[in-house]
Amino acid sequence: MALSAQQIPRWFNSVKLRSLINAAQLTKRFTRPARTLLHGFSAQPQISSDNCFLQWGFKTYRTSSLWNSSQSTSSSSQENNSAQSSLLPSMNEQSQKTQNISSFDSELFLEELDELPPLSPMQPISEEEAIQIIADPPLPPASFTLRDYVDHSETLQKLVLLGVDLSKIEKHPEAANLLLRLDFEKDIKQMLLFLKDVGIEDNQLGAFLTKNHAIFSEDLENLKTRVAYLHSKNFSKADVAQMVRKAPFLLNFSVERLDNRLGFFQKELELSVKKTRDLVVRLPRLLTGSLEPVKENMKVYRLELGFKHNEIQHMITRIPKMLTANKMKLTETFDFVHNVMSIPHHIIVKFPQVFNTRLFKVKERHLFLTYLGRAQYDPAKPNYISLDKLVSIPDEIFCEEIAKASVQDFEKFLKTL
């Protein structure tokens, strides 16, 4: 068993003490050269106790210095052998036998060190040893936040560097547990390379993964198949990149679902293939969101607001958000524009962006123009004001070019409302 860092000094002192004792015994017994001592030390008078320790040190912690020491000891042994070559042959033979037995004893001593049991955890230690102990903080068995695991997880650390907001992911326990089980090199690296190939920039990866953390549970080959399907429908690489950025969950849907969604909009709206493709590129969440708001709004335009089918087609291709807009907002905006401002359907169809504007902004500007006597929305009459200019330009230009008044006058009027 290998010795721990705390056990080395203690074993070093004990072995060194034993080597000194054996060295003393060695001196007394030198007159009997054929006899050897236990614990791996040979009966050669010219080998000091320090050399003996370095030569037969810890088996587990052998280093280059130990090897050099053993080499120097070997050279000393060779000098001794040459010096004793003039002695009787029996003395040389006895010396060789002694060295062989000593090497065998050293092997036994090393094996004995290896088999020594570790120190007991209840054994007292000094203050210096206690200070040197560095204990890692324990991994919490359970937690409500991923912050407790960041120091222990390389995956979480690298996701944070990418800009992933773990505080949002931890609100979904299943997703948080999934991240803790993932290996960055095996499970996440290839996914990041795939997303970059699709068109997600480095500075967009953090926000994308924060929103669509479920993509890590998707099979990479399935994701590639879905991208290939979009390309087969003549969506360019730039189109796919734009769609994935605007609708991060797009790639989580199967090819069958994507195909059904494209077919629904082409059939329901009676659009051409190109117009259907342009529609979903501008608003890709049409492929990922619920179809119920779309179906409901189509009924509202036809039955409640009174638009014709071709008029609906024109408006939604201009402003795709009209398909998913809030029903109440649509009806309130139409009621004010059509019934209060007296703007007919055919003019509203030409400027459908009015449905994408905050209603209070339309009301404020219309009431200010009415106060000034300039609320004229009939293109056949002079001083005509289009809906486009009414809702799209900033206050400074509206006051200067449309209302022919100052911004201060407009602000004073708003205080009276």
Swiss-Prot record:
Comp. bias (Low complexity): 69-88
Any one biological process term the GO annotation gives: negative regulation of DNA-templated transcription
Segment annotated as transit peptide: 1-68
GO molecular function: transcription cis-regulatory region binding
Key words of the record: DNA-binding, Mitochondrion, Ribosome biogenesis, Transcription, Transcription regulation, Transit peptide
Cross-referenced Gene3D superfamilies: Transcription termination factor 3, mitochondrial
Region feature (Disordered): 69-96
Protein name: Transcription termination factor 3, mitochondrial
Organism: Homo sapiens
